[in-house]
Design a protein with these regions (language model features):
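Hydrophobic transmembrane alpha-helices that form the core helical bundles
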Residues: 14-93, 97-101, 236-260, 292-312
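Helix-loop-helix junctions that connect adjacent transmembrane segments
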Residues: 3, 80-84, 112-232, 236, ...
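Hydrophobic alpha-helical transmembrane segments
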Residues: 2-7, 48, 86-91, 116, ...
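TM-loop-TM module centered on a large, flexible mid-protein loop between adjacent transmembrane helices
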Residues: 35-43, 75-79, 185-248, 266-301
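Transmembrane helix-loop boundary segments of multi-pass membrane transporters
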Residues: 1-2, 68-85, 105-115, 234-241, ...
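A generic transmembrane alpha-helix motif of multi-pass inner-membrane proteins
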Residues: 128, 322-397
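Juxtamembrane helix-boundary/capping and inter-helix hinge elements in multi-pass membrane proteins
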Residues: 28-30, 39-46, 171-179, 186, ...
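Membrane-interface loop-to-helix entry segments
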Residues: 84-132, 143-145, 184-188, 306-317, ...
Length: 397
């Protein structure tokens, strides 16, 4: 079933990736995917609400990844002490925020090292576990209902969120029209192959109950039967690298995004300020939100929200793409299929989650309402300020 999920999620990600690659090649900008929404729908409330939704979803995902880092670090160094999970999560958020403050070159170098280490070790893990798979554990008899599989695609979409980050790198590329699509397709292709191989290896080694009980350390536990305790430690170190890299990737686009959205009045102007001439206020605010989420919220209870909101946003971007497809040269059929595929997964996810995890749906609604309220509230304040300035600058009679 995990293999089917990976295939389905990879297919949806590939369809959205095609849309993003075409948009990125035509509109290379620091605003990334939110710039694409503006191209299709203008700079009104729709784009503003989408911007705040993106900010919220990315913060949830970044905080959740940081907590995963904390789980592995705590398991390795403190015997799984829950207090240390939070401490390590805070440390990785702070460390990666500093990396992003130092500059894009350090971000790129750090991310390159992390990617090579993680991809290399995960490939080794996949080969070793696949060589010792128990086919009985992968038998279709153990699969859940189709509706649960379709619903889970929205959750496992979390694994592919990195390709959305690629759209924000256009400002740092020498030839974005050529390099961005290539990076998009390579990232999606490599990720899909590795995820499918890992899914087969893990679920062909452990029972579903063992995977669930292992929680965030399931990958390390799956390495033990073949590689022993050394395998557990190897995969734990890999997980530390992977989650550190994902935290870094979550923080990377915030500076450019905040500046671009403040410029178009989607975000308040103070989010574009550079404190001390260097430190992005938007980045600090985002990091603070991530810290609050990591410290004070049960992210396991709302783990699906960040992924589902991201899929919703990506679908809206592809809808926006349909409105400017003549400018990008994208294939209309592929864009329509991308929208329809996501349109099937999202309602199924909402319905299934409403039954099994009503708290997650409540959280989703709260995020939507807050995004609408913040956008309308901020733009009303901006309109009042503009009117006041115009009134004060008008010549007195």
């Amino acid at each position: 079933v995990r293999n089917r999920q990976s295939n389905s999620t990879g297919a949806i990600a590939a369809l959205q990736g095609y849309s993003f690659a075409k948009l990125g090649a035509r509109y290379p900008t620091a605003g990334g995917l939110l710039e694409y929404v503006a191209k299709g729908f203008g700079d009104g409330h729709f784009t503003g609400i989408t911007a705040w939704l993106t900010f919220s979803a990315n913060a949830i995902v970044t905080a959740m990844v940081a907590v995963s880092f904390g789980s592995y670090a705590s398991a390795m160094f403190t015997g799984g002490d829950t207090a240390w999970i939070k401490i390590f999560a805070v440390l990785i958020i702070v460390a990666m925020t500093v990396v992003n403050i130092v500059g894009s070159n350090l971000v790129a170098n750090a991310q390159t090292i992390i990617v090579y280490v993680v991809v290399g070790i995960l490939s080794f893990f996949a080969v070793v576990t696949l060589a010792n798979v128990n086919p009985a554990l992968l038998a279709p008899a153990g699969y859940p209902p189709l509706s649960d599989i379709v619903s889970s695609v929205a959750l496992t979409f979390f694994a592919f969120l990195g390709f959305g980050i690629i759209t924000f790198t256009a400002k740092d590329l020498a030839k974005p029209a050529h390099e961005l699509p290539r990076a998009m397709y390579l990232a999606l292709g490599i990720a899909t192959i590795i995820y499918i191989a890992i899914a087969l290896g893990v679920f062909g080694t452990l029972t579903v109950e063992q995977v669930i009980s292992s929680g965030g350390t399931a990958l390390a536990v799956a390495a033990e039967p073949t590689l022993g305790s050394a395998g557990y430690w190897l995969m734990s170190v890999t997980a530390l690298f992977a989650t550190a890299g994902a935290t870094n990737a979550g923080l990377y686009p915030v500076t450019g995004l905040s500046e671009r959205l403040a410029e178009t009045v989607q975000f308040p102007g103070f989010m574009a300020r550079r404190l001390g001439g260097r430190v992005s206020a938007g980045l600090l605010i985002y990091a603070l939100v991530c810290l609050v989420l990591a410290l004070f919220f049960n992210l396991d209870a709302i783990a699906s929200i960040g992924s589902a909101v991201a899929l919703l946003i990506f679908t809206l971007i592809t809808v926006a793409h349909l409105r400017v497809r003549t400018e990008t040269g994208a294939n209309t059929v592929i864009l329509v299929v991308a929208v329809v595929a996501a349109g099937v997964v999202l309602p199924t996810f909402v319905f299934t989650t409403l039954i099994h995890e009503p708290a997650s749906i409540v959280t989703l609604l709260v995020i939507l309402v807050l995004s609408v309220a913040v956008d309308f509230g901020w733009k009303r304040v901006y309109a009042n300020r503009s009117a006041s300035r115009e009134s004060s600058s008008s010549p007195k009679v």
